[in-house]
Swiss-Prot record:
<keyword id="KW-0717">Septation</keyword>
<keyword id="KW-0132">Cell division</keyword>
<protein>
    <recommendedName>
        <fullName>Cell division protein ZapA</fullName>
    </recommendedName>
</protein>
<comment type="function">
    <text>Activator of cell division through the inhibition of FtsZ GTPase activity, therefore promoting FtsZ assembly into bundles of protofilaments necessary for the formation of the division Z ring. It is recruited early at mid-cell but it is not essential for cell division.</text>
</comment>
<dbReference type="InterPro" id="IPR053712">
    <property type="entry name" value="Bac_CellDiv_Activator"/>
</dbReference>
<comment type="similarity">
    <text>Belongs to the ZapA family. Type 2 subfamily.</text>
</comment>
<dbReference type="Pfam" id="PF05164">
    <property type="entry name" value="ZapA"/>
</dbReference>
<dbReference type="GO" id="GO:0030428">
    <property type="term" value="C:cell septum"/>
</dbReference>
<dbReference type="GO" id="GO:0000917">
    <property type="term" value="P:division septum assembly"/>
</dbReference>
<dbReference type="GO" id="GO:0032153">
    <property type="term" value="C:cell division site"/>
</dbReference>
<comment type="subunit">
    <text>Homodimer. Interacts with FtsZ.</text>
</comment>
<keyword id="KW-0131">Cell cycle</keyword>
<keyword id="KW-0963">Cytoplasm</keyword>
<dbReference type="InterPro" id="IPR007838">
    <property type="entry name" value="Cell_div_ZapA-like"/>
</dbReference>
<dbReference type="InterPro" id="IPR023688">
    <property type="entry name" value="Cell_div_ZapA_firmicutes"/>
</dbReference>
<dbReference type="GO" id="GO:0005829">
    <property type="term" value="C:cytosol"/>
</dbReference>
<dbReference type="GO" id="GO:0000921">
    <property type="term" value="P:septin ring assembly"/>
</dbReference>
Amino acid sequence: MSQQKGKKSRINVEIYGQQYSVVGDESTSHIRMVAAIVDDKMRELNAKNPSLDTSRLAVLTAVNVIHDYIKLKEEHEKLKESMTKKGME
């Protein structure tokens, strides 16, 4: 849920042991949730690839997250098509 137009949220978050100041249109709770997911994903991938440096780990995390996003987007499109064919939309 977006905040009022033009109103930005600023929050400090910790991702993989580093502090970041994040500014966005979403609520602070949304930004915290996004940061927590990124942190969790980085830690999950680090457990599987402990020799990766932080930069490579960050890129691998981005690749994995975008992969998940694309898969969900494709599933969403298939569901929309299915609903349209059944006259549910």
